């Protein structure tokens, strides 16, 4: 047991991805008027809650991870950290994260962190992941919470932009997750996890991917239509979304579904990263805020 093992069970890669989306939501709401104290609270608080959820997920999925090639060497599967200690660690991380958001951001940001945690750990990890093909859809809601937390940390309100972020990031999760399920098909089948490719086939999954990317593309444009993001953001969102849709369409003619799915997965990360960056820098400044800057 070492510090490295405690870091590994928090899934740092997932935390980093969520930091980008928290920052995107925060800077979109800030419109250039940044409170760095609140920003740090939003980023660190969300990271702690996400880390907590990942540790709990590792605890819950020990039996599944034993049956999957890519996860059978995880820390808890190998017994490098005890279950009791991991559960205590996860609890401390979660409580600390929510407390930080509540005290240094606002109660609404903390509430969305709790909602995301409950969905991911309670609904998805404990129940739906093992029992329903719709587990991915429910789990996508938890993955969409970080940008909403970042946004609400600034505004302390759930408005059209916050709703758009929730819808955008939920829709993005679906083709992203389905791509993983395709190129990790054998692992999911061996672990008896009822993801869409395993339950209904890869062709059906490709159709779902197309529909979700199309819906995601439309949702991304709503930030500009609603007056929250600028035209540069719109251009990037439209371009990335349409190319992602084109890549999905090419899947119908793919010779190797595994190779195609990996490419689709990688581009999904590029897409959401680009949009998080663009909404951070190409926001719409209201007349009221311009007056604030002027004086």
From Swiss-Prot:
Parts of the chain that traverse the membrane: 9-29, 36-56, 80-100, 108-128, 135-155, 163-183, 209-229, 230-250, 265-285
Keyword Membrane applies: yes
Catalytic reaction annotation: heme b + (2E,6E)-farnesyl diphosphate + H2O = Fe(II)-heme o + diphosphate
Enzyme class: transferase
Biological process terms in GO annotation: heme O biosynthetic process
Alphabetical list of CDD domains matching this protein: PT_UbiA_Cox10
Pathway: Porphyrin-containing compound metabolism; heme O biosynthesis; heme O from protoheme: step 1/1
Membrane topology: Multi-pass membrane protein
GO cellular component: plasma membrane
GO MF term set: protoheme IX farnesyltransferase activity
Compartments, as annotated in UniProt: Cell inner membrane
Top-level taxon of origin: Bacteria
Enzyme Commission code(s) on record: 2.5.1.141
Annotated keywords: Cell inner membrane, Cell membrane, Heme biosynthesis, Membrane, Transferase, Transmembrane, Transmembrane helix
Note: Carbon 2 of the heme B porphyrin ring is defined according to the Fischer nomenclature.
Record-stated family: Belongs to the UbiA prenyltransferase family. Protoheme IX farnesyltransferase subfamily.
UniProt-listed PANTHER family: PROTOHEME IX FARNESYLTRANSFERASE, MITOCHONDRIAL
Role, per record: Converts heme B (protoheme IX) to heme O by substitution of the vinyl group on carbon 2 of heme B porphyrin ring with a hydroxyethyl farnesyl side group.
Protein name stated in the entry: Protoheme IX farnesyltransferase
Name of the gene encoding the protein in the UniProt record: cyoE
